[in-house]
Amino acid sequence: MLKCLFVIAVVCSMVACNKDYTGQWVSIKPGKSLRGWDTDGNKKDFGYVGDTLLLTGQSTIYYSGRINDARFKNFELLADIKTEPNAVAALWLHSGDVSGYQVLINNTPTSEERRKTGSLSNVRNIYKSITSDNEWFTLHVKVVKKHITVKVNNILIVDYVEPDEPYRTEENKGMRFSYGTVALSNYSNNNVKINSIHIRPLPDQEIPERKDALDEQKDEIIRMQQANFPVIDFHVHLKGWNQEQAMAHSRKIGVFYGIAPNCGIGFPVTSDADIYTYLDTTKNLSCFNAMQGEGREWPTTFSEKAREEFDYAFTDAMTFTDHKGRRTRLWMPDEVWIDIDHEKYMDIIVDRIVKVLKEEPINIYVNPTFLPEQMMPEYDELWTDVRINKVIEALVTKRIALEINARYCIPNEKIIRAAKEAGIRFAFGTNNADSDIGKLEYCIDMMKKCGITERDIFFPVVKPVKSQYVTGK
């Protein structure tokens, strides 16, 4: 009788192990003894408070349970997670000894780790979390062949297709889609809480393969991502496209955007109420919220409280009152009156730039050193050392970053080198006139020529956001 019961138990166990879970959501949350998971560290780095799993130390746990024999290729995963301040963790996918991708978990705006929650590490880095510490959020990852999407609270953050020949550095050569287990790593000594983890294996057959991967062998952006250089266009406008189109393009090319409305008299945003209305439309966008101040009246047009709702503010000095009291806009040929010699007019431009930098509440000076079209052929001669130094001194004094502008290809290399020597931070920006935004080509060229490193790049301190928590399974 006992022998018969033993055989039945073994058979039942084998049936359970061999069960096909394809298309089914299954919990793979570790048991309180980490049942179904292995660890590369001390089990004391993991524990439970009630039904909540705690990752308390710098260790990794690997799923080793019975679902798909812990070998996943096409799948979806949902996890409900909460972080303490300064916690940095990761979810590993297709993990093996030296392979796999990791999705980062980091919600602290001021942490030294700039890559935030949802980042597909060093492939599609995200620089602003749409959730906050001490709040539950849902991480949703889906892998189909060579296509991965990452959602946070049901908001699409990453949409990446791995090409047949991806660009990978030697350090990151294991970042390839194949198959493997999933793992959780805590890179800090701050707690990460896991309320649930569910996985759904997907079928191998009848899944069309995405064919819209970029050619990474010729792509500069992936090289910067692999080097953990912050790939950010701080100066993007919704001109010629809408929010959804801009976000889709950002995800595709791997450049994180700072999207700015034009704020000032005669522009789309003209009041504090307009600011709050605009920001209400950006709650579900994975981007920086930037403010472009227009004209010289903008600091008094908007309250300080409303201005500070943005992640950062910028302006240029292209609008000013000239030597005869005429309102001048340097980029509009019919609103520029050069009735004195170019040297004298250049002194007026420099004086107006310095005044703007000293008096207006900005983080970045954009469209920098711009000259009207009549004077552009003399750009290098007109921007003398004395004039350059006046602008650099004002930037240093007010701790303002200098934009390297991809659209106008300014400032020139000489000015950028002088700014770097003075310790000024840089922001790459486009100031697009339409949806043909490019990929920061001039900025990257100057980065290489002038030896700009990731520590030379401006980075805003953003306010924590209120999570729009959508529970998982």
Give the predicted meaning of each segment.
Residues 1-7:
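Sec-dependent signal peptide recognition
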Residues 9-24, 223:
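Bacterial Sec-dependent signal peptides at the C-terminal "C-region" and cleavage site
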Residues 17-216:
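Carbohydrate-interacting regions of secretory-pathway proteins
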Residues 214-227, 379-473:
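Charged catalytic cores and adjacent phosphate/nucleic-acid-binding surfaces used
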Residues 230-233, 256-258, 286-288, 311-314, ...:
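Structural preference for beta-strand elements that scaffold enzyme active sites
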Residues 271-397, 452:
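Extended substrate/RNA-proximal surfaces in nucleic-acid metabolism proteins
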